[in-house]
């Protein structure tokens, strides 16, 4: 059974961070050990929230407790998302190092959350530097959106060629696999959005309809599903197709519900067995 140590935020109401990643992974049959970096009432997109931000030493202590059970050797991947500060980033890197010492075959999957093309960069100014210089070089898999890819590599991905060049620059930094979770190239068909996966054996693109929806947590679900499918199959193209199909079904159901939060529980069957099967195109 695949086991993932997921170090992310958590909310009581809604689905972001671990509250978005854990259930879909479990629905796929993955054992998930969540370590929370915050436990808020709701995500910060509402403009107001309550609850504690975990101190770095508290997060480290939870990982240490897992290590003391002799369990880190069972971990196949460490998954991280939004990092609220530099110290949390260092705790994540320490957890990765300890996990890989216990299981050299384990991978580190990093969702380098920084912002998007609409909102710009919305994290502390130190975070992009931390990600670029310390975190991404230690990752085996990263899942940026197109904006974050450009920020990390100090490039300007636009069309397919420039986006592939930016991915190559990211892979030169350390990760062997890059999933670009939202590619908005100017020459794509109208009302569509794409994902691009690049692995050591090629590059693949998948296109889905672009729904008129802004859903907090969708990137967290995407990173989790792709990590799980890649661990299971070892095939980036298969992982890409499965992930895009499940995420589209989730977003479609969320859009149809008229609700702001992801309809994760309501979409559980589509997460495991997506209704839509989108074709994956080899682009290199």
Language-model features and meaning:
Residues 237-284:
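Charged C-terminal helix
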Residues 208-226:
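Short glycine/threonine-rich catalytic loop with a Thr-x-Gly-x-Asp
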């Amino acid at each position: 059974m695949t086991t993932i140590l997921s170090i992310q935020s958590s909310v009581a109401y809604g689905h972001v961070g671990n509250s978005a990643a854990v259930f879909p992974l479990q629905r796929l049959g993955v054992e998930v050990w969540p370590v929370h970096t915050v436990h808020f009432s709701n995500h910060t997109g509402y403009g107001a929230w309550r609850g504690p931000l975990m101190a770095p030493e508290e997060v480290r202590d939870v990982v240490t407790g897992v290590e003391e059970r002799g369990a880190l050797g069972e971990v196949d991947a460490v998954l991280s998302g939004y990092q609220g500060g530099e110290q949390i980033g260092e705790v994540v890197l320490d957890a990765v190092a300890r996990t890989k010492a216990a299981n050299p075959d384990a991978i580190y999957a990093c969702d380098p959350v920084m912002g998007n093309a609409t909102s710009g960069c919305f994290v502390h100014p130190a975070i992009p530097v931390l990600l670029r210089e310390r975190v991404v070089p230690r990752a085996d898999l990263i899942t940026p959106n197109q904006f974050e890819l450009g920020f990390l590599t100090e490039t300007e991905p636009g069309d397919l060629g420039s986006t592939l060049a930016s991915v190559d620059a990211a892979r030169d930094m350390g990760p062997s696999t890059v999933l670009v979770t939202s590619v908005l190239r100017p020459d794509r068909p109208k009302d569509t959005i794409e994902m691009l996966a690049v692995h050591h054996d090629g590059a693949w693109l998948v296109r889905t309809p672009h729904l008129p929806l802004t859903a907090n947590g969708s990137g967290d679900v995407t990173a989790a599903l792709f990590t799980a499918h890649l661990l299971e199959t070892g095939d980036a193209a298969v992982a890409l197709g499965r992930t895009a199909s499940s995420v589209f079904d989730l977003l479609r159901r969320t859009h149809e519900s008229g609700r702001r939060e992801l309809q994760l529980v309501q979409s559980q069957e589509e997460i495991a067995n997506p209704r839509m099967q989108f074709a994956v195109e080899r682009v290199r």
